[in-house]
Regions:
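Phospho-regulatory, Ser/Thr- and acidic-rich intrinsically disordered linkers and terminal tails
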Residues: 1-164
Length: 164
């Protein structure tokens, strides 16, 4: 994500965006669709490593919570890992694949030292209209940004808080 480049789609169609992304050396493409009042409503993750782009994951957002005290979040020195709270989560593994990062399972169960590492932690919530919270941690410290996930869908399955 820190190597990501933001491109204003403008009037470009999807194929033009794919060609542009590949020209920049991208292996993944993430599209942000608008929700209510222009806020992010949906994230679509595509794999560009094949001849035809493949949709890997769709995430419907409930919202984004920014830190109380705005500050810049610097690019991590070591690669980011995706981890889950409360056991193995299919969604966390699918998110790791979509972002092209490693999924290490439940926090603390991998035996790997996380000192100096940044994590994208997936916490299950399972409330009506809210399935997961994505948190960014560094050295077990919350960096403040939270992404609230309403539901998700992959090529293989979909999930929402009510089980549908």
């Amino acid at each position: 994500m820190w190597s990501a480049r933001r491109i204003n789609r403008g009037s470009s169609n999807f194929q033009e965006l794919v060609v542009l992304s590949r020209g920049l050396g991208a292996r993944r493409l993430t599209l942000v669709d608008r929700g209510l009042h222009g806020n992010p409503g949906k994230l679509l993750f595509y794999d560009l490593s094949r001849e035809e782009p493949a949709l890997l994951l769709v995430i419907w957002l409930r919202g984004v919570v920014f830190p109380e005290k705005p500050r810049s979040i610097k690019k991590p020195v070591a690669p980011l890992f995706v981890a889950s709270a409360g056991g193995y989560l299919d969604f966390a593994e699918e998110l790791a694949v979509a972002l092209n990062y490693s999924y290490i399972g439940e926090v603390g169960s991998s035996g790997m030292s996380l000192t100096g590492r940044r994590l994208l932690l997936v916490e299950p919530v399972n409330k009506r209209n809210l399935a997961y919270v994505l948190k960014f941690l560094e050295d077990s410290r919350d960096l403040g940004l939270k992404i609230l996930v309403k539901r998700f869908a992959t090529r293989l399955r979909s999930s929402s808080p009510d089980g549908s």
